[in-house]
Swiss-Prot record:
Metabolic or biological pathway: Protein modification; protein ubiquitination
Key words, A-Z: Cell cycle, Developmental protein, Growth regulation, Transferase, Tumor suppressor, Ubl conjugation pathway
A Pfam entry, by short name: BTB_2
Domain notes: The BTB domain is required for growth-suppressing properties.
Tissue expression: Weakly expressed in lung. In the cerebellum, higher expression in non proliferating external granule cells layer than in highly proliferating ones.
Membrane-spanning intervals of the chain: none
Subunit structure, as described in the record: Homopentamer. Interacts with KCTD6 and KCTD21; KCTD11 and KCTD6 or KCTD21 may associate in pentameric assemblies. Component of the BCR(KCTD11) E3 ubiquitin ligase complex, at least composed of CUL3 and KCTD11 and RBX1. Interacts (via BTB domain) with CUL3; initially a 4:4 stoichiometry has been reported, however, electron microscopy revealed pentameric states of the BTB domain.
General function of this protein: Plays a role as a marker and a regulator of neuronal differentiation; Up-regulated by a variety of neurogenic signals, such as retinoic acid, epidermal growth factor/EGF and NGFB/nerve growth factor. Induces apoptosis, growth arrest and the expression of cyclin-dependent kinase inhibitor CDKN1B. Plays a role as a tumor repressor and inhibits cell growth and tumorigenicity of medulloblastoma (MDB). Acts as a probable substrate-specific adapter for a BCR (BTB-CUL3-RBX1) E3 ubiquitin-protein ligase complex towards HDAC1.
Further details from the record: Overexpression of Kctd11 by lentiviral vector injection inhibits xenograft tumor growth in athymic nude mice.
PANTHER family referenced in this protein's UniProt entry, alphabetically: BTB_POZ DOMAIN-CONTAINING PROTEIN KCTD11 (PTHR14499:SF7), POTASSIUM CHANNEL TETRAMERIZATION DOMAIN-CONTAINING (PTHR14499)
Cell cycle is among the record's keywords: yes
Residues of the BTB domain: 1-49
Naturally occurring in which organism (per UniProt): Mus musculus (Mouse)
Protein name: BTB/POZ domain-containing protein KCTD11
Length: 232
């Protein structure tokens, strides 16, 4: 069919060509048609790396009845095998437990004073079916306390920022640890839920996820307790 269109002795019937110039107008997909012409010129299939429109090109080859191109496309699909699915689920839960910590504060050489301060302990559980995204989460946060096992879909964190009033020695005695995010040059402490969820959101979007649900208040994203992301 394609050859007939280009032969000089093949004219379009006058009743199908109101302008009377006797030429065909090929109204097909331009991007796919470029690869068809390349195949006819080179005699081989030469597609760019990662070309993802083989189904469209196959339909065009079938329309033009180019059997060798159809065979080449079938061989290409067979060599690629079944494409890996990109669908994935990411779920982030975070909970805070405030507690009152009592300690003795030194006010002088022989003067101690009983004091207390509230310490917020955060616990987060990240569940992700995409290992690359989960690894990026680990890299973004590091691990304060929790599961260091590789390969599972869960990543758990537990941390607590040290209030200014709480002495460092008391903070360490309680076995508490902070959580940091970012690289060496832009490292910052994750001191609250909004900061944690903001980082989760950044990593999720970088890996192609979209926000699916927010709990408990969909209107208050960064102060939520649970975020669910999906990728199709």
């Amino acid at each position: 069919m394609l050859g007939a269109m280009f032969r000089a002795d093949t004219l379009m019937p006058a009743n199908l060509n109101p302008q009377g110039d006797g030429h065909y107008f090929i109204d097909r997909d331009g991007k796919a048609f470029r690869h068809i012409l390349n195949f006819l010129r080179l005699g081989r299939l030469d597609l760019p790396r990662g070309y993802g429109e083989t189904a469209l090109l196959k339909a065009e080859a079938d329309f033009y009845q180019i059997r060798p191109l159809l065979d080449a496309l079938r061989e290409l699909e067979a060599s690629r095998g079944t494409p890996a699915s990109t669908a994935a689920l990411l779920h982030a839960d975070v909970d805070v437990s405030p507690r009152q910590v009592h300690f003795s504060a030194r006010r002088g050489p022989h003067h101690y004073e009983l004091s207390s301060v509230q310490v917020d302990t955060f616990r987060a559980n990240l569940f992700c079916t995409d290992p690359e995204c989960l690894a990026a989460m680990r890299n973004r946060f590091g691990v304060a306390i929790g599961d260091r096992a590789e390969g599972g879909p869960h990543f758990r964190l537990e941390w607590a920022s040290r209030p200014q009033e709480l002495p460092e020695v008391e903070y360490q005695r309680l076995g508490l640890q902070p959580l940091w995010t970012g690289g060496p040059e832009d490292r910052r402490e994750v001191a609250n839920t909004p900061t944690f969820l903001e980082e989760v959101l950044r990593v999720a979007l970088e890996h192609g996820f979209r926000l699916d649900s927010v709990f408990p208040d969909p209107e208050d994203l960064l102060n939520s307790r649970s975020l669910r992301f999906v990728r199709h």
